[in-house]
Amino acid sequence: ASDVYKRQEAVITWCVGHLVTMSYPEEYDPALKKWSLQTLPFIPSEFKYEVIPSVAKQFQIVSSLLNREDVDTIYVCTDSGREGEYIYRLVEQKAQVSGKKRLRVWIDSQTEEEILRGIREAKDLSEYDNLSASAYLRAKEDYLMGINFSRLLTLKYGNSISNYLNTKYSVISVGRVMTCVL
């Protein structure tokens, strides 16, 4: 399967889920690779992002298409919702896209009729800036909670759990979704 569909008037490509993620603490400072209570809480003044290595090829494809000189309008067709908005905004940010007209396609189903309606009625991407801001905020909260509480609980209780389970090392993973399920 090709990674791009080309037509005379359009080029179509896709993300494969998330292409960009928040960087681990050691990308801010290599000393943070070693977990220590003295480095907690980890709260960066500015968040860093990186391309996910396993999907780097697709990111390069999407990035190069978004930045092509002959592309003047981008139709953003990621999932209609906060996470879909976040997926596109991270790609756009990391790819340093600028000077393009950006329209958001918002659809409620995958029928041909609904897709065509979504394209016809696409709105300027800026109308979804609040949704994007909420997605970034949710991601930062998840990141800070996960990084800090996982490290804290692992440092405090990891050895006890390892001894109980008779394993060499135990990481206690904490996160918004995981914690609710537990």
Where are these regions (language model features)?
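Prokaryote-biased recognition of long, low-complexity C-terminal linker/tail segments
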Residues: 142-182
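Intrinsically disordered, low-complexity regulatory segments
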Residues: 2-151, 180
